[in-house]
Amino acid sequence: MSFVSVDLLALARDATYFNTLSATNITTPAISLLSYVPEFQNVLGENATARKITDLPWEAFHEGGIYNKNDNSLYVTSNYQSLEDNINITVISLDDYTITSTQFPDLWEANGGTSYYPPGADQSQTPPQQVYCDEGDFEHYSSLVAVDPNTNTSTVLLNSFLGRNFSSLNDVRQHPVTGDLWFTDADYGYYQGFRPQPSQPKQVYRFEPFTGIVQVVADGFVEPNGLEFSADLKTLYVTDTGAQEFGFNGTRPATIYAFDVICEKTLASRRTFAFSDIGFPDGIHCDTEGNVWAAAGDGVHVWNHEGVLLGKIFVGETSNNFAFAPGKVLVFSNSRLWVVENLKAQGREVCKDFGIGCEK
C-alpha cells in the first residue's frame, strides 16, 4: 500500500479539499495511510502495509488492547450493550488473528486497561497480570480491577477515592519505575445509562498499590479519557473527549493536554498539545521516538513531540483505541479490526510487554 500525500496548502485554502481525495471520499470504511508531512512515512516505514482483519456484527473492538504472553493474544474490551450483558473481553490471537470472547469474575463493565506488575512481581519478566478500569453499574462500584487471564482470577485494587464513589473509571497506565497506577475518571457510564449521576469532579488520579495512597493529580476537564506517558516519562498526555457526552458538540474539547511529571508523583505546567480535527482523541499511546498517537473520529492520528500532525491511519470511522505489537499496530473501530503491518515505529510499552525491541 502506498501513502496518500495530503497537500496542506490546498487544504488550508479549500475546506472541501478532502472530497477530492479518493482515499477519504468513501461510502464504506476502508483503511489508508494519509501523510500530512513527509516525516510520517519515516515513522511508519516505507514498507508499511494496511488492511482490514475482520468485520463483526457486534462491537467487539472498543478499548483496552492488553498483551498476554502465555497465549500471545491481545485482550480488548467490547462496547457497552446492556445491563443484562456485561462487557465482554475480546481475545485476539496474534498468531493467526482468530477471535474469541471471555469474561472475568468481578469485572462488570470493563473499559480501558494496561499490563500490570503487582507489588513484588519480577519486573525482569513480562507483566503477569492486567488491570482494567471497571466502569461499574448501579450495583457495583467503579473500580480498578487486576486480572490474571491465565488463572481466570481477579482482585479489586481500588473502588473509591477515600470513600467517595468514582463516576466511571476510563483508562489507566502503570508507571514503569514506581509501579503507581495513573487513571482517569469520566462520566460515560452515566451518559450510557448504567451508572448513577456523578457525585465528584472529573479528574486524573495516582494510586499506589503498595501503600493504598490515592491522590488527585489533575482536574479541570470536561471528560478526561485516555492517558499516556512519554517515552522518557517526563510528560503525561491526557485526552479530553468532552465533545462527546449525550451527543457530539464540536464546541467542546476534543483535545490532548500535556503535563510535566514532577518527581514521578505530581503534575505541573498543563498546556494544550493537540486538537483533533475529526471527532475526538480517545485512546492514546506514544512510540519510542517521542511521537504521540491517538484514536480519533476517522482513525488514528499521529503527532510529533511538538504537536504537529504528521499523518493518519485513516479508516473512515471512529476508532476508540489501538494497540502496538512488534512490527504492527492494530486499530479498533468497534465492529471492525484493522492492522498496519511492517511497521517501523515501536510503541513505548512493546519492550516491557513483549520482551522484544528492548535495544532501542
Which positions does each model-derived feature cover?
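Beta-rich, blade/repeat-based domains predominating
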Residues: L56-D71, D106-E135, F161-L181, Y188-G189, ...
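Blade-level signature of beta-propeller repeat domains, shared across WD40, Kelch, NHL, RCC1
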Residues: N321-K360
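Flexible "stalk/tail and boundary" regions
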Residues: L94-D95, R206-F210, H301-F314, N321-V329, ...
